[in-house]
A protein has these predicted regions:
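Conserved helix/coil segment N-terminal to the catalytic DExD/H
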Residues: 87-117, 128
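Conserved helicase ATPase core of P-loop NTP-dependent helicases/translocases
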Residues: 82-93, 257-261, 268-302
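Conserved helix-turn-beta segment of the N-terminal RecA-like "Helicase ATP-binding" lobe
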Residues: 62-86
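Conserved SF1/SF2 helicase motif Ia
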Residues: 20-33, 38-67, 144-145
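Post-DEXD/H (motif II) to motif III coupling segment of the RecA-like Helicase ATP-binding lobe
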Residues: 125-195
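Conserved pre-motif I regulatory segment
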Residues: 1-28
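Conserved interdomain linker/interface between the two RecA-like ATPase lobes of SF2 helicase motors
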Residues: 173-250
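Conserved RecA-like ASCE P-loop NTPase motor core of nucleic-acid helicases/translocases
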Residues: 53-61, 245-252, 273
Length: 303
C-alpha cells in the first residue's frame, strides 16, 4: 500500500507522459520518502499493464542494487526480475526487469538488447558529458530502441560545479517534485531536523571526485583514522547523550565496522550493516535499532 504522496508521484509521472512531453523526466524525492517503494509499484504496474515491457533499473553501487531488488520482492513477491552486477556475481539477462550496476553494463547494450524504460537511482551522478558511462549506455540502448524513455530519481537534482541536472547539456529535461521535506515532516513521515555545530573538522584535501562525487576509496582513506573516528564518536556521545538512537553514515565498509567497534568499546550497544550483511541479520539489527535494544547503528551505502 503506497502512501498518498507516493501514489501522487506515479500519477504525476503518468500525466507527464500523457501530456506528450519530449525528453526524460527526473523525479525529485526527499531522502526517506521511499523511492524504492515507488519504483517497485511503477514497475509492477507497467509490466502488468504492458506485459512485453522491458525495464532496466540502474544505480552505481551493489548495495543499492540489492536494496532496490529486495524492495521489489517485498512489494511484488513474484516479480520477474534479474540482477546484473559483477560485485554480486550475478549476470542475469532476459528478465522483464533487470537491476544492474552501471559499471557492469555500461558496455553491454548488445547483451541487454531491447529496453523500453530505464530507471536511474541517484541520477544526479549522471554526467552532463556525453562520454559518461550512463550516457554511453543510454545512447547505445537508444540505437536499439529509438523510443526508449529514461526516468531519473534523486533527492538532489543538481551537480556541484554544473548546476541543475536539467541544465544543458543534460540528459534530463524536466523535474517532477511531488512532495517536499516540509510536508513529510508535517505528516510525521520524517522526523524534524535538529542540527548542531561540531567542534571536529575533517580535511578532504587531496580527495578527488568522479562524476561529481568523492571517490569512495580516497574518502575512506582520509576519514577512517583512529584519531578521527575516536573524536567523532566522543563528540556524538557528548552532544547526543540524551537521544535514544544514533545512526551513522560512513565512508565505506571498513569505516563502518571501525566506528561500530569504537562505539562498542565506549559501552554503547551498536551494530553495523553493510552490503554483504545477510538479509536475516540485517532485519534483526534494524528491528533491534527500532526497538531501542541497539542504540547506535553504522552503515555504508545501505540505509
Amino acid at each position: 500500500m503506497l502512501r498518498d504522496y507516493q501514489q501522487r508521484t506515479i500519477d504525476q509521472l503518468y500525466q507527464w507522459f500523457a501530456d506528450g512531453r519530449k525528453g526524460h523526466p527526473c523525479i525529485e524525492l526527499p531522502t526517506g520518502s521511499g523511492k524504492s517503494h515507488i519504483v517497485a509499484a511503477l514497475c509492477k504496474e507497467a509490466i502488468q499493464t504492458w506485459p512485453e515491457t522491458r525495464i532496466l533499473m540502474l544505480t552505481h553501487v551493489k548495495e543499492l542494487i540489492e536494496q532496490n531488488a529486495e524492495k521489489m520482492r517485498d512489494h511484488w513477491p513474484n516479480a520477474p526480475l534479474g540482477i546484473y552486477s559483477a560485485g554480486m556475481r550475478r549476470r542475469d539477462i532476459g528478465e522483464p526487469i533487470t537491476f544492474a550496476g552501471i559499471q557492469s553494463v555500461r558496455n553491454k547494450a548488445d547483451q541487454i538488447g531491447h529496453v523500453d524504460l530505464v530507471l536511474i537511482d541517484e541520477c544526479h551522478l549522471v554526467s552532463h558529458k556525453q562520454e559518461g558511462g550512463y550516457r554511453k549506455l543510454i545512447d547505445d540502448l537508444t540505437l536499439i530502441n529509438p523510443a526508449l524513455r529514461v526516468i531519473g530519481l534523486t533527492a538532489t537534482p543538481y551537480r556541484l560545479g554544473h548546476g541543475y541536472i536539467t541544465d544543458e547539456p543534460a540528459l534530463f529535461s524536466d523535474i517532477i517534485a511531488p512532495v517536499s521535506i516540509e510536508e513529510l515532516i508535517f505528516k510525521k513521515h520524517l522526523a524534524p531536523l535538529r542540527s548542531k555545530l561540531t567542534a571536529h573538522h575533517l580535511s578532504v584535501d587531496g580527495v578527488h571526485k568522479r562524476g561529481g562525487e568523492y571517490i569512495e576509496s580516497e574518502l575512506q582513506a582520509a576519514v577512517d583514522t583512529d584519531d578521527h573516528n575516536v573524536s567523532v564518536v566522543d563528540e556524538v556521545i557528548s552532544l547526543a547523550g540524551d537521544r535514544r538512537s544514533w545512526l551513522f553514515f560512513c565512508a565505506g565498509v571498513r569505516h563502518a565496522h571501525n566506528v561500530a567497534d569504537i562505539l562498542t568499546a565506549r559501552g554503547i550497544t551498536s551494530a553495523c550493516i553493510v552490503g554483504d550483511t545477510p538479509k536475516a541479520e540485517r532485519e534483526r539489527i534494524i528491528a533491534g535499532f527500532k526497538s531501542g535494544e541497539i542504540r547506535a547503528l553504522t552503515n555504508a551505502n545501505v540505509l
